[in-house]
Structure formats: C-alpha cells, structure tokens
C-alpha cells in the first residue's frame, strides 16, 4: 500500500502523479477502518482527501503555516504527517486528538476547535512573517459553514485591506454557498486558474498608462466585465471587492487541477482566495447520502452504516421534546440554535413549529442579541447552545440581555465535562461567567424529570434571563427529585456534607454510601439553582459539619464552591475542612467522562478518598 510508505509530507512530494489517486483511495479506506471503531468526525474528512493531499504536495507544512478552521477535517492531515499509527487512540484519554494540536506535531500550526477564527489567526501569522523578515506561506482552511460566523468576515475585511500575501482555502461542500451551474462559469474558472490570464490582465492595464481608470474604454470594459461576473459568478465579486485575488471555483476532487491552482496561488502576491467545491462524505455511500449523520458519529458498522450502540434518550432530546410541547401551548415560545439543530435536540421543535424555529448559523452572539430583541417585544425566545460556544457571546449576554432584565432562556447543552472532543469542547466555563452576571438565574437539573420541571419554571415562572445547564448524554441512576427549592437535602448525615449539582449528584450519593460504610455520617445537598445562590439555606445544611466538600466539574475561579466558601467565612461558620473538588485551573483533555472524572477526583472514589484523608488528618 502506498499509504504505508507515507511517514511525512516529503513522501507525498516524492510520489509520481499517477500514484496520487490510489493514495486518496487508501486514505478513505483508512478513515473508514479507524473512525468506524473510535467514532469521530467522518464525512467532513472524506470530503477533503484530495484537497489535503494537494496541500501537502505543494506546500511544506513543517515550514509553511496551515491554520484549520474548526479542525473537523484534520484527520487526513494527521494521517499524512506521521500519525497513522496513533489512530487507534483517536479522541481517547492520552491518545490522538481529533483536532489540530501543535504539541502533537510541527505540522499543526494552531489549536482549532471553534469556528470562524482561522482567517484572523492566519493574518496574524502573515503580519508576523513580514515584521520578522521571514519567508513562508500562510494558509487558512475554512469551510463555507464557518462563513456564517461574523468573525470570518472581520478577518477577510482586514486581510483584504492589509495587502499581505496569504491564501484562504474555501472548502465549499454546499452547506451554505449556492453552487454555480453551467458550462460557461466552469470554463471561466479554468481560464482564471492559468497564470497567462493574470499576465494578460497586467498587460491590458498597462495599455492605458499609469491611470487606466481615466480611460473611457477601460472603464466601459471594466463595467462590462463586472456585470458579467456578478451574473455568472456571484461568489468572486465578494472576495475581489474585499481585495482578494479570487481563484475558482474548482472541483475539489480533481487532484491535478488542485495542485496547479495551489501552485499558482503560492506564486501570486497579496491575499488570495482559492474556492474549492467538495462533496462531504465522498467515497462512502452512506455518508454521501446522509453527510449530516456522519459528521460527528459514534462507532458504527462500516458494512451497514448503523451505529454499534443504539442511542438512548438524552438531556438534549428531552429538552427539545419538552420545549416543543410547551410551544404547542404558548405561541410566544420560539427556538433558536447556532448551526446545532440536531445536536441540541431541536429537530422535533423545527418539525412541529417551523415558523418559530431559527437557525442563525455559527453566530452565537447574533443569536443572543436576536433573542433579546424578541424578548423585548414580548416573545419567549429559547436559545439552545453548547456551553463551549455560548462563551463567544458573553458581551451580548451582559449588554443586550442582563442589563434590560429580558426574559431570554438559555438551554446550555454539553455543560461540564463532555468527553472525546477535548479541551476546546468541554463546558467548564459557563458556571463562572453566567453566575457573575447580575440578574441571571442559573438552574442545574440532575435528571430528565428535573429538566422538564426547570424548563417549565424558566418559561413561565421566572422573570428575567434564565440559563438551564445540562450535560451531554443520559441521566444517572438515583431517585430524582423535582422540588423547586434552591437547595435540597438528598441524604441525611452529620459529619461530612457533600454539596453538588447536575449529574454529579449521582457521584456524591455513591460516595456518601461508601463513607457511611466507613463510619463517616455523610449528608448530600443538591443545588437546583446556583444563581442566585440561596446561601442561607445552604449554610443551614453545612452548620456543625466537620468537613464540607463542594463537588463541581468546572474551573475553580468563579465556581460555586468559591462563592460558598466565602459565604461561610463571612457568616463566621467554621468547620475543620472546606474542600473545593473541581478542575482547579486545568483544561481537561480528551477521554470519556468517566475517565476524566476519575483523573480529576470528581467520581465517587475521588470524593471518598478526599473526605477520608481530611477526616483522618483531623483525627
């Protein structure tokens, strides 16, 4: 196999041109064999096989800088840069990351995970290159879906104005950019990809002297050309008006043409856009038919395309179903998502109430501001968004929502430790930033039943902004409590008090049982609401305890534990040990939630160990 001989991009450049199609075929088979076992981002990688091979054929990513946007499509890049043998550990604890990571390889120029930032990052690198008098190529690889994010246009605007030479590789798989249809645009695309076209363009301008725009003939021809371009080739004028040289659109699976186009882009000066059409899921029939299903997928049977383990009910699906039911009773309720309809469980809402469902694209800040406008006019907007992406809209939460005390409801999905996507996708900051905003109510269900109750509260009983934070996946095994009290005692005890919220309640209850067997009487207090904190109720629960442990899967700064420790000190409540059991200041890596909880001492075993150590020190 050719792929077995590829240990670095130098090996790709050493291949004969006629070997490259076979390499692409082997790469797709490699992806199928590995991702079907580990799960991961599949269809997006199938779509960029030829493009990635062409990049490594033309550029030297050990020297040049390739900045991925989001990074979903980096698997092929990793396989070609010396990491094939690690794919059995993909997205696993201490294994190969599913996203670009500079600590893994010199070929990974920048960490990726969130969308729309690649152009800005690449411009920063290009400007550094100029200031440092260095010589290397800079590329930003961005998908058309990421162009729904405003940050991408901020970057493009600045790149065009800068005049810096860098290349924006636009991977257009048809999700948000209209395709160009017909033979003439295709012919023009081929013409514009040739160096002779640009030599002629320069020569033609020279015919009219130093100020060609002063010539009536030149101005007429320029207007005619622009009019034809806008009719036949609408994408090009956007980038050219911004100051880019636009190349394309071209077939992203035509490897020889890709190599020619990238070589020409490399030789140009100033900012360049190379517009490439690809097919998401190419080469695997099931992914071609349903690329969305195979975008991020759990382990599956490669023969049938079916998941090896049938998905069960999740917090996301319960949220979407409950919200849809409530919307059937109240026409003011609207649902908003930021390109995550299926992931946030809102498909059922969109099907039942399409006129009140809004997908704003990768534009979380816009989603929050739009929700604020809807709330101001009497609607009840509900924005379902992953915790890690909500942090992109912090200013809007403060300025547009909280300052006016608007009734905006946030469904903060994937809160806490998420799992295999690693540092960029855990939801470990929302506790700190949401509880810091005056006027916000933050609710934390530990079960599906509690989620239903709290969503009803948020919609109909609580004034002002409300956030409901819930984890990825299913509920734990314990007796659910649907009390609307801010703090609920789940288990009696007097020596140690465990305080927690969300799905960590299950870990606290298990730990309390083990501690009881060891002779330590342990109380468990579940917080249904972490903002505003009912400190009086919580302090009543902690009074007289020898050890108080606050268990959270978030960072310590701004945590509930930090707030409670301060409240205990202010109230003069003294116990032998007040322990904040959380992530401290560590970004959690890839791994299953159970593995990560164990690593950071957030599972029942970790809690038992900490409490026993504290109590033994006291004795």
Question: Which residues are covered by each model-predicted region?
Answer:
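Structural signature of the thiamine diphosphate
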Residues: 217-286, 407-413, 432-479, 547, ...
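A glycine-rich helix N-cap at a beta->alpha junction
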Residues: 86-96, 161-175, 196, 402-414
